[in-house]
Amino acid sequence: MKILMTGHTSPIGTMLYEHFKYDIHGCSRSNGYDLTQLQDIEKIVERSLQYDHFLNLAHVGTAQTQLLHLIHRHWTANNKFGKIVSFGTLGTELPLKVLQSLKTPMEYFTQKQSLEALHRRLCIEKPFGPQPQSILIRIMNYGVKMGERSSEPTCDSMDVIRTVEHVLGDPCYVSSIDLRKI
């Protein structure tokens, strides 16, 4: 299994990159891919044909949504049927008042909502038969929290690894997973 991914230098990405290290190639600014530049996004899209699956983790503006759209379209045109796993957030489901208390820029949630909307369209575009599979993993509270949030349950690296292994290895089309501890 060969995997191409963006976001391999982020906390979740680093952990996934290390876990799959013999079968994965990361694309980031550190190795020549600037996800704010369309020509670099297009290079990733073209390169993705050489891999079995794509992990779409890097949140750089609208790059995640662009990559999902362009890779899905490119794979469809080339009869490639791998899995495109995008990472969202369950934060998009939280009430506005809670979101504002998190002090995360609202633009982040707007961009993740766009990613989710595109995923919902692509995952049912063709109900049956061979096709690229858009998979969305939405995570709530990854990593240890500090201060007033220190008592919140959080997902750890093994939770994410198990989930990614599940969606990549399962013969069924697992379209969406909401991952959180309660």
Which residues are covered by each model-predicted region?
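Structural motif
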Residues: K2, D52-H53, K83
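N-terminal Rossmann NAD(P)H-binding glycine-rich loop of SDR-like oxidoreductase domains
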Residues: I3-K21
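Adenosine-cofactor binding site in Rossmann-like domains, unifying the SAM/SAH pocket
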Residues: Y22-E46, H59-Q66
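Conserved NAD(P)H cofactor-binding loop of Rossmann-fold oxidoreductase domains
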Residues: L55-A63, G88-G91
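NAD(P)-cofactor binding segment of oxidoreductase domains
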Residues: H59-I84
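Catalytic loop of short-chain dehydrogenase/reductase
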Residues: T76-P127, V144-G147
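Conserved Rossmann-fold SDR core element
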Residues: L122-Y142, Y173-S176
